[in-house]
């Protein structure tokens, strides 16, 4: 009997400690949210609304703000970037799921003039804490200064601690070990990732969006396949591009054009993966060239 009583007492004591730790972690999260949510949530709401708007309907009315294009060259400025399939622009949930796999690609490299260093030159890392001041641990597990434009995938990941989902995960943590893991992740994010994310979001002057349509005859992208669906980007396809100036929420560019290029010359490539990567790069650069021509004064290409 004494053993049973002792066991119950120990269990209740452990549960009390877990609950105390849970409430302490949630209090720390509320303090962070109180400071950062007013900066992040309005911007997130704006870019998600723009993304849904650009993806809506079968037609896209071409638009260029001539004055902004003439006097405000965004290509050497700090900005935000997101690339999704058009199916992932259907609603907020789809955008957030797709953003988890959105990466910088040949489109930004060919369009913008940001002096980014190679993502492979830094030392190996497991998390941002392993890197120097101003550096983060990138998707290649290398320390590097955040590249421009800043991919919204990283912002969504870093600022996940402000979300209702994070609070639910904390409420549902079953025991001490799970709560310790959440606490450790929270501390790493607050110490290492949030300062960089907030700085880049604060400095951003534009939002650049690409929505890839499915190639003719191809099945639509579903779930969180995102721009990582290589087959979609390798084939010729139509894409929608939007550009917004963040200071006044002004639409600067809206267009739909074909992302398609023919590789000419060079050595014959027999490796299918290498050939596919080259074709994706060429298609993305062709898309960037079309955007550049519109910005420089050409008419937006009408939809077929």
Residue ranges and their predicted role:
Residues 302-304:
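Short, solvent-exposed mixed-charge patches
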Residues 150-152, 159-160, 165-166, 175-247:
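Surface-exposed short loop/turn segments
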């Amino acid at each position: 009997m004494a053993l049973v009583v002792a066991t119950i007492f120990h269990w209740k004591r452990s549960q009390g400690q877990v609950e105390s730790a849970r409430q302490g972690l949630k209090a720390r999260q509320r303090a962070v949210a109180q400071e950062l949510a007013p900066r992040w949530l309005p911007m997130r709401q704006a870019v998600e609304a723009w993304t849904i708007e650009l993806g809506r309907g079968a037609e896209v009315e071409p638009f260029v703000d001539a004055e902004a294009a003439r006097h405000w060259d965004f290509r050497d400025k700090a900005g935000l970037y997101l690339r999704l399939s058009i199916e992932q622009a259907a609603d907020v949930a789809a955008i957030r799921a797709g953003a988890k796999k959105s990466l910088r690609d040949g489109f930004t490299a060919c369009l913008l003039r940001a002096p980014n260093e190679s993502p492979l030159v830094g030392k190996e890392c497991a998390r941002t804490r392993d890197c120097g001041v101003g550096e983060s641990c990138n998707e290649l597990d290398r320390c590097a200064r955040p590249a421009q434009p800043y991919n919204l995938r990283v912002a969504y990941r870093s600022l996940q601690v402000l979300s209702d989902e994070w609070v639910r995960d904390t409420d549902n943590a079953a025991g001490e070990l799970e709560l310790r893991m959440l606490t450790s992740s929270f501390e790493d994010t607050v110490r290492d990732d949030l300062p960089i994310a907030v700085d880049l979001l604060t400095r951003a002057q534009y939002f650049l969006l690409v929505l890839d349509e499915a190639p003719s005859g191809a099945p639509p992208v579903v779930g969180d396949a995102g721009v990582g669906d290589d087959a979609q980007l390798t084939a010729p396809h139509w894409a929608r591009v939007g550009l917004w100036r963040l200071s006044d929420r002004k639409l600067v560019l809206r267009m739909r054009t074909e992302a398609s290029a023919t590789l000419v010359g060079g050595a014959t490539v027999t490796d299918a993966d290498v050939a596919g990567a080259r074709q994706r790069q060429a298609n993305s650069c062709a898309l960037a060239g079309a955007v550049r021509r519109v910005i420089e004064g050409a008419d937006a290409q009408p939809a077929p």
